[in-house]
Amino acid sequence: MAKELSQEEVLDFLCQSGGKVANASLLVHFKRFLRDPQAADAVLLKRRDKFKRYINSVAVVRQEGSVKYVVLRNRYQDLLGEDIEPAAAEDAGSEGERDQVVLPTEHGQDYLAHTFGQERLKQANGGDVICDCSEARAVVPSAAPHSHSQSWDVGESMSEKARVNPSHWDTKRYYPEDPPVPDSLPVSPPCTNTRQSSFTSTSRPHNHSLSSNNLSSSFSSPESPGLVAKPYNASPSPAGSSPNIREQTPKSQSLSKAANAAFVSVTCTDIKEQREGCTELLAPQPCQNWDYSQPEQLHSAQEHHSDLHREHMTNGFHSPDPLSSKYPHLTSPCTPLQLSPETDTTPDVPLAHNLAAVSYPSPPLPGNNMYGMWMCQIPVFKSIRCQLSLQDLDDFVDQETCGSEESDSGEGGDCDTEPRDNDDADDDTFSSDSHKEIPKLCVEQESEYLHKCHSNIDYSGKNDLYNSLLEEDRIGVKDTLVEHGDVASMRIDTSKSVYTAKSFLTDQAPILFELVRNAPPNKTSSCFQGALSSSDEELLDRDYRKRRRSSRYKKSANVSVPCVQPDTDRLLTAKCVSSSSFLINNNLQEQSTQAQFLPKYNSNFGLKKSASQKSSVVPLDPKEHDWIVKTAAGLWIQVYGMFSMDPHLALHKDFITGYTALHWFAKHGCIDLFNKVVIGAKKAGIELDMNVKSSNGYTPLHIAAIHGHHKVAIMLVEKLKVNVKVRDNSGKRAWQYLNSATSGDVWQLLGAPKGKTIFASCALHTAQNLNIRNKTSSQLARKSSLAAFRKTQHQRRKANNQSFLREREIYSD
């Protein structure tokens, strides 16, 4: 039964039904909304109209016998099979235990939007708990073995780890005016490796809370690409502790809400699924004096989380510091997160770390701005790709990358994160306090733009870790350490990374940037385009982009700014590379980012330039051109000389009329050269098609009949055995083009029908002319002579009879 009447629900049901479902089954599935006895007639009518629009937008109705089926449209057929598959049931005794908790959001707040689609996480095991997107519930599946995981520790002490089960949930209801203070930081990583695995929350308020001491989440073994949560010192769950939460948590039993959350995109061990996970980390609850009016805390908190990740990636351990130095408003300390350096992959977004000595304190993070702080990469339906064309996608990425002209981000491809032209521009760093907007991502698009870090962080071993990731995934991420006095900054070159822009705050931006992965050939740096392009259209376009670019920002001339665009045929098609491409590539070897796209860009540009400047000119071989001109002009001596040197010229067609040399011979009536060319081609081993057609469908026999060259037609039929039944594009045969002066033998030779009345012979023409002359003379004699009126009636009748007998004799002959 459907839970809501929406486009996503209709598309989900059709995809789960294999793209084809009976009309009756579809109506039964949405019966709750279409035939609600408690709803008014007007509401039901609106629902029916809305339901019809939803169906017509994604499916069509087909009649098969007496049953009507609703069939998914072809553009959505690629969505079949992409729904989240049930996780395979695992034996709790052999595989251990695996805890996974999906925590609710704060009262009246959503961390994710409806536009990501309603997704369901299904678990096939009877002991597992179904997690629905409309109601945030806990999921407690089996755990992965402890020996194959590296853990992120969340808790104040390692000895107080406890397994989280439904029996630990608190039943007390809290409200925003009385925020609770939980003792742990629950973590909810995804467990599936499908592209649709995600945890989403809706606008419905959730009343769930967790009251366990500590919880830890860990990476699974390299064999399983997904992420699982695993506690230390996990105690076996009691009997009956893992039934469905839907049965254990009635309406009367509600759980408190977490005040804020942060979304971190975690890279899985599988390269193909490294950006599929989305981990929801909940910070501890604040005390009574929570302050929600501090938007400046976001940047400092992001740096705080980034420092932890860098410290863990370097040392593999940490020394926990109290949270009071960083967040004095909190009564419960924030437990650190641990990531072992032996892991093969690194999170896409840096995690958090607590620093004891900081120059300024940061207040706690409000929950209503968490969606803007962290990029949560949520997979959505591929119908976005079906609805957006390549041009729309290009425009969308341009808009998301550069923003509008009136915005403070400037214009141009590399104006997103450029530092302002102020006194601190020489430091190549920018402070997080200089921006009052939602903080930018830690992974920037350009290699020149740096993110400020604290000076007491060790960066040893950072390059080795990212180099291993670069060799495996080849996403083009390079790290360079730059130190300016007491400030160490990390610069990341993401020329091919999927995260190449700051504007990931929209709903579909993460999945769009993941789809396109590669830089397009037509989006290179301005100096590179200046070296290659020469057409007026591209020059005007480049000048227009320069005028639109804001003068407050500096332009980097040696860094290419790729605008993301799909390149799905890169491994399927092979494109020819001209020699000039290798010359340019040799001259620009030091520009590795630009040179790797140069051959493809140069070939496309060459084709575009030749098509625009020489659209009306078709290049021909000089010998072929001379052959066409000489055969059309009837220069038979030169034609036969060229044929003697290259007999294959007889096979060449005129690109306009489609005539071959045989057509020209038949048109000019050159029977001698016709015979010589045919005999010479046989000697050279070339088979000539005597029934070859021109652009209008004319064969040489048609051409000979049209121009009245009967000798050529007789030779073609008798000696060369051409097919007289071939028709041209008008549906006519060769004999239908013969004129009246053609003899009957030629008519019969070209296949004219025997019962067809052909033109009269000469004798018949003479007799008919004589008869007409006699009739005319007799009529003139009767009308013009006065003696005719004096003749008797018998004489006039006798004269008329004689003329009738004379006409009979003529026709009998």
From Swiss-Prot:
**Protein's name in the database:** Ankyrin repeat domain-containing protein SOWAHB
Compositional bias segments (type: Low complexity): 208-244
**Span list, region Disordered:** 142-256, 400-436
Please verify whether the record's keywords include Repeat: yes
User: Per the record, where are the segments of Basic and acidic residues compositional bias?
Assistant: 158-176
SMART domains, alphabetically? ANK
ANK repeat ranges per the UniProt record: 657-686, 696-726
Q: Which gene encodes it?
A: sowahb
Its source organism is: Xenopus laevis (African clawed frog)
